[in-house]
Amino acid sequence: MEESQGYLELYKSRQHDFLYPLIFQEYIYVLAHDHGLNRSILLENLGSDNKFSSLIVKRLITRMYQQNRLIISANDSNRNPSLGHNKDLYSQIISEGFAVIVEIPFPLRLVSSLERKEIVKSHNLRSIHSVFPFLEDKFLHLNYVSDILIPHPIHLEILVQTLRYWVKDASSLHLLRFFLYEYRNWNSLINPKKSIFVFSKRNQRLFLFLYNSHVYEYESVFVFLRTQSSHLRSTSSGALLERIYFYGKIKHLVEVFANDFQAILWLFKDTFVHYVRYQGKSILASKGTPLLMNKWKYYLVNFWQCNFYVWSQPVRIYINQLSNHSLYFLGYISSVGLNPSVVRNQMLENSFIIDNAIKKFDIIVPIIPLIGSLAKAKFCNVLGHPISKPARADSSDSDIIDRFVRICKNLSHYHSGSSKKKSLYRIKYILRLSCARTLARKHKSPVRAFLKRLGSELLEEFLTEEEQVLSLIVPASSTSRRLYRGRIWYLDIICINDLANHE
């Protein structure tokens, strides 16, 4: 009966965007626990039945509103040791709960919009690899690219204000605002100027949600301006935009430029503008001129400062020519180069030599940062020489091999779109030899003798699925190597590999 009541509350919240009752539902915090919350925090009695309980959450929220909310009494500490030693108890529990709760309306609204417009959902669009075919298709026809460092908001309150356009529940927003205000006071004693950065590190899930919601709001200007300039409505992006207060922001923008908005709109009539965001950076590419790119730069700076109260400077936006610049993001180095080709043309008695230069989009694996990640994880030294992993020497042989093979296959899977596989082969060699050194250290035998005794079994373990399939269907002396050099994009990768993330 209690479970049915919980689902009933969730259904009501879906209908009315009323999230406050969900704060006191136990299954919300069980779900938050599954995303990394420490298990001992949400235990009502550590010595009895170990049940998750929202009673602690209710007490914590009540204590937040009390005058002595920042003081945890000695009696509470004695009754429940898990409440006494953790200074960030309020932050950890409530932020994890909020992170789950405030995310509820967004996928529901998106799904309902897609169903209403009869748009077929595609989970493959979530894949990181889906970005690269887009870049490969579009960037060949563009001239300039801007590397943008996205500014952070100067106050946490700005992040809450963004949610007002989506969440209509004033009680939840008030509690979230009060929580962020108290969190800033708690950390102001230590570092008053960097409270938002401290919050982002200790409450990553909630901060990333608030930050992405905020960035998403001022990113929508690209779709809006493009729609206004081309006079075409995009049905695919209509479900993703909330334009309730945008025209009010335009009026404010008019005061800044002291000009009519339609008079400056011609600056942005560029149908070849493409925008990609990744982590804290973004890319704005265009077929226009350097003058147009500079106008975009100063427009973005003024737009961020005047409408979203984030401080930015033009020097945070770097404009480069695509033919002379490499893009480094998502674990790849991407560049647009020229692939020369010579064609001999025969016309009657005359022959001509025609030189053609075809643009080619190259995507390669950055070997030096990747070796740095492997060295930091103790797979090799800073020069790329494989070393043993002493921490894994106590495990069984099968566990050691499985761990190294899993890391190798994950990296190969993620970097399968590389144009040049030589760097990837070196990474595989480092992991394979590091695995052999770890096993040899465990068995106290020389590496060469251990590899000789093991034979080709260890090498076969490190073969990826693509290599295994090609070895079966294509003879080794044929074009298998040429086939494997081709780029392969997977549409099931939804997060950046930890070793591939060098940011």
Curated annotation (Swiss-Prot):
The lineage of its organism: Eukaryota, Viridiplantae, Streptophyta, Embryophyta, Tracheophyta. Belongs to the intron maturase 2 family. MatK subfamily. It is found in: Plastid, Chloroplast. GO terms for molecular function: RNA binding. GO terms for biological process: mRNA processing; RNA splicing; tRNA processing. Usually encoded in the trnK tRNA gene intron. Probably assists in splicing its own and other chloroplast group II introns. Its main location: plastid. This is Maturase K. It comes from Liquidambar styraciflua (Sweetgum tree). Pfam families: Intron_maturas2 (PF01348), MatK_N (PF01824). GO terms for cellular component: chloroplast. Keywords: Chloroplast, mRNA processing, Plastid, RNA-binding, tRNA processing.
